[in-house]
């Protein structure tokens, strides 16, 4: 697990918007999305509900805490 991915997840959880979080992290939205997907695969859980609006799942909230 990369420390960078953990930090990116914290920022994304704060903004709940990939574009805004990516901009604040000085990276691209596709790159951020890839890192979060890799983190989810590594943990074996879904951290975010990607529907009309981005939301943390119960596992995502627990992981953030």
Ranges and model annotations:
Residues 40-58:
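A short LG(V/I)-centered, amphipathic sequence patch enriched
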């Amino acid at each position: 697990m990369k420390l960078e991915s953990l930090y990116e997840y914290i920022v994304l959880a704060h903004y709940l918007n990939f574009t805004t979080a990516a901009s604040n992290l000085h990276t691209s939205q596709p790159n951020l999305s890839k890192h979060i997907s890799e983190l989810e695969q590594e943990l074996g859980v879904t951290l975010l509900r990607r529907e009309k609006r981005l939301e943390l799942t119960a596992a995502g909230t627990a992981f953030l805490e």
